[in-house]
């Protein structure tokens, strides 16, 4: 039996966190290639450490892209995040590029040819989730955790809070009653900052940000409001900790409130079902909840490398559904082509829309006119209602 009253926590990390720097660089490279060739293949991994950026992976592109373009794109990503520190500077960090041509053995399984449809880029399982507890149809703890850090970054970049530096983390613990968010029991924020500031200084700079983000009356007790609990946080970013692409997969998704198939998103073109199928599952789950067929919805799909059709589709409405789950599965199969090509076509994923996803969550965002966050549209809700 599921519990209706409990306490749950999610965390987020800022765009300047070392792993997120790597995600941003990797997705910037994906965008660079897709901007030249919508059918480009990219698997770009990034490592960062003190004044070092290392790119590695496999690519294929119909248009020429030279090393200078790749390096310029990576440096611009770091510049936009805001790193101009002695230990990590967008302009002076050493960049090593080990990207090379995609394996023909992988390509032969993925590419369409003759009567063979485009296959999945790998085997695996992917999940999507939605909940009606926030307007974004996302879990509340991860939503507020993202919003705190996004607001801090906006203040830093605008010059309103120059005391903040790019590297930061947040964590929000919420109390649920009858399965509904009822308050915040604690908030943790750790942020890199300019030298010469005390812990109390940073605490009072962070306080209004948290107050603005949380609903009125939800600010935690003073003793449960933690800011830079270890004290000074001047050395940070890749200079403080090495970063790698794909290490913040729970931050990227649902903050631990839903299962994760294990595959990271950043650095991958949309033929990789780790990314595209997870986006499709979120799209389907969000439309189920938007159609008011359930308060919560988890969807799982699975694939085999080189095979176009998904091997399975599973729906769990967590006891909140107004429809039979097996019938809902049939309706989703009828309405959505979940082959890799079907997903890319329906969600228009062959576009340079990925750098913007690299921080503050891939889900719960606002769709844009250029096709960004297309998986957040609720354009399937009416059709689902009519079928069920």
From Swiss-Prot:
Residues reported in the UniProt entry to bind K(+): 45
Reactions it catalyzes: L-methionine + ATP + H2O = S-adenosyl-L-methionine + phosphate + diphosphate
Alphabetic keyword roster: ATP-binding, Cytoplasm, Magnesium, Metal-binding, Nucleotide-binding, One-carbon metabolism, Potassium, Transferase
Region Flexible loop, residue ranges: 102-112
Single biological process term from Gene Ontology: S-adenosylmethionine biosynthetic process
Enzyme Commission number(s): 2.5.1.6
UniProt-annotated binding residues for L-methionine: 58, 102, 241, 272
SUPFAM superfamilies on file: S-adenosylmethionine synthetase
NCBIfam families: metK
UniProt subunit comment: Homotetramer; dimer of dimers.
Name of the protein: S-adenosylmethionine synthase
Gene name, Swiss-Prot/TrEMBL: metK
């Amino acid at each position: 039996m599921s519990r209706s009253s409990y306490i749950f926590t999610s965390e987020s990390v800022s765009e300047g966190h070392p792993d997120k720097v790597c995600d941003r660089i990797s997705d910037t490279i994906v965008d660079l290639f897709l901007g030249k060739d919508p059918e480009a293949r990219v698997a770009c991994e990034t490592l960062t450490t003190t004044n070092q950026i290392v790119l590695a992976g496999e690519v294929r592109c119909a248009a020429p892209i030279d090393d200078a373009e790749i390096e310029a794109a990576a440096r611009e990503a770091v510049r936009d995040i805001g790193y101009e520190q002695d230990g990590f500077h967008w302009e002076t960090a050493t960049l090593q590029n080990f990207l090379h041509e995609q394996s023909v053995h992988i390509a032969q399984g993925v590419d369409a040819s003759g009567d063979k449809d485009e296959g999945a880029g790998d085997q695996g399982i992917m999940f999507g989730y939605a909940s009606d507890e926030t307007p974004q149809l996302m879990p509340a703890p991860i939503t507020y955790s993202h919003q705190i850090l996004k607001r801090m970054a906006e203040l830093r970049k605008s010059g309103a809070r120059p005391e903040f530096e790019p590297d930061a983390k947040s964590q929000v613990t919420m109390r649920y009653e009858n399965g509904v968010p009822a308050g915040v029991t604690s908030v943790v924020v750790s942020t890199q900052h300019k030298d010469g500031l005390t812990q109390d200084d940073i605490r009072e700079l962070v306080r209004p940000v948290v107050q603005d983000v949380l609903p009125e009356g939800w600010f935690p007790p003073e003793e449960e409001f933690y800011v830079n609990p270890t004290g000074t946080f001047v050395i940070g970013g890749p200079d403080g900790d090495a970063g790698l692409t794909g290490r913040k997969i729970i931050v990227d998704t649902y903050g631990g409130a839903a299962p994760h198939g294990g595959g990271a998103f950043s650095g991958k073109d949309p033929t990789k079902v780790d990314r595209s199928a997870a986006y499709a599952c979120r799209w389907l789950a969000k439309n189920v909840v938007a159609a008011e067929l359930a308060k919560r919805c988890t969807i799982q799909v699975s694939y085999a490398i080189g095979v176009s059709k998904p091997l399975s589709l599973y729906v769990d409405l967590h006891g909140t559904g107004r429809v039979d789950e097996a019938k809902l599965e049939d309706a989703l199969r009828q309405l959505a082509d979940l082959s890799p090509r079907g997903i890319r076509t329906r969600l228009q994923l062959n576009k340079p829309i990925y750098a913007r996803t690299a921080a503050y969550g891939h889900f719960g965002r606002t769709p844009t006119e250029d096709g960004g966050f297309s998986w957040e549209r609720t354009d399937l809700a009416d059709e689902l209602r009519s079928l069920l």
